[in-house]
A protein has these predicted regions:
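Extended, charge-rich alpha-helical interface modules
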Residues: 2-71
Length: 71
């Protein structure tokens, strides 16, 4: 029988890890091809925004691990 609580928490962590991968890839693109991103003339600000998004998703994973997976 599937434990719904554990399944929901696992899926939330998978979702946040996907967001981290997405924003990490965006940073890599900015670092390797900054001239290819026409709508972002301020590459540093764009990278900062991506890193903030990574930090938010990482923090949510840490909250799940600390508050909901410890029994």
């Amino acid at each position: 029988m599937i434990n719904l609580r554990d399944e929901i928490l696992k899926n939330q962590k998978t979702y946040y890890n996907g967001l981290i991968a997405k924003h990490q890839q965006n940073v890599e693109i900015y670092l390797n091809q900054p001239v290819g991103i026409g709508e972002h003339s301020d590459v540093m600000a764009a990278i900062d925004g991506e890193i903030n998004a990574i930090a938010q998703a990482h923090e949510k994973i840490e909250i799940i691990n600390h508050y909901f997976l410890v029994r």
